[in-house]
């Protein structure tokens, strides 16, 4: 009888309800802390998922769309000006069960070469040594494809990926492409990612939003979770796209 009850409880979380659970879970995101240096980040005992990518790749818009909050992740009007690592907590109030890390954009910063190099080193150190790092979401503009800096980042994290670190390449601004162009971009990115997971994403059309939310939830809850673990009926919020999303910027 006990086994039947347990099986029934596990079966009650269907793929559809799991996606809804994941979307509601993402909506619990709130600001946790910010740091200008790696050593200033507090150690966390929960899964941490990092969002990385070039400036103008739509990273802030992606985070705000996934969490259904307009201004959770700050998007600077000048690409590359955001130079802090920002952490956002997920889970019920007083019960954090995962962290999202928003890393500074790279490749377009209107700052000095020394500052660029410093931040590239900070990011590399974070990706290589951050304890608790469970997954990485690399955001790319599919109209530009993966740049040399994106490929360099892949090389930095490859040893950890081979050890089990989760990795997703997210092609943002999918609404700018036709279906045929999306299919081509996916094929190219999959080759560049060395067989890693690749998905299309559009904040404007909400393409891939539920799918990505569910994937991140699975990364953070490998043994599953009960439907009562997160609030329900999270309201969907229309997130404004970043002002620089109309045309791709060339890497510097």
Predicted region positions:
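Conserved G1/Walker A P-loop phosphate-binding module
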Residues: 2-108, 232-234, 239-241, 251
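Switch II of P-loop NTPase G domains
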Residues: 41-43, 81-87, 98, 104-134, ...
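Canonical P-loop GTPase G-domain recognition
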Residues: 26-38, 176-232
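Active-site glycine-centered loops adjacent to acidic/histidine catalytic or metal-binding residues
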Residues: 102, 172, 202
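Residue-level signal for inorganic ion chemistry
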Residues: 88, 172, 212
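Helical mechanochemical/support elements of P-loop NTPase systems and associated helical scaffolds
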Residues: 45, 71, 84, 96-99, ...
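Conserved C-terminal guanine-recognition region of P-loop GTPase G domains, centered on the G4
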Residues: 121-197
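Intrinsic-disorder-associated, low-complexity terminal segments enriched in Asp/Asn/His/Tyr and depleted
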Residues: 244-246
